[in-house]
Amino acid sequence: EGQPFMTTSCCPSYIQLVKKHIPEMEKYVSTTLSPMRYTAEIAKEKYPDCKTVFIGPCIAKRKEAEYSENVDFVMTFEELGSILDGMEINLEQVAPFQIDKEAYLSSHGYGSTGGVTKAVVEHLGGPEVNALLLSNLNKKNIGLLRAYAKSGKCPNQFIEVMACENGCISGPVTRIDKATAAKVYTKELAKMATQREQK
């Protein structure tokens, strides 16, 4: 509150970048935990003896899990895919899942560029946010973040930062290429929206 701008906090690679290389940015980073940590916290409250496993396209989640007593294991899509292949399980033949109709539909879009910003705007129910979307922690974008942190000034009030180009859907341990991932993701979000309308 009262800061000239704020950045997202859900990408663990970005958080490590700030801690190690741009400490001046730390005060501008949201204190909101990532969905992985909130979900694990809820699971442990509801089922105290359970073991929680985060499955995703991100290796950096392993580092983030070290900061949470609620996340027991982290598995990548590549690892899960290898297990499914080894057990000869074909996901195309598995019954489709039903989405939680109480959840914000936009929260399912977190994994792609602009998804976090959209979810924030929907949750607040206010006007559009003047956001900068940085979904590639290359030299240019790191330099930009460093400049904003050191000057304390940014033309945008909100910066959504994701280490991977196009967001988490292009994470380093997915099993499909970026273009296919984006198509599948968009298709699944549309399917979820249709399911919501039918409820």
Segments from the language model and where they lie:
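Iron-sulfur-associated redox domains of electron-transfer enzymes in respiratory
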Residues: 1-199
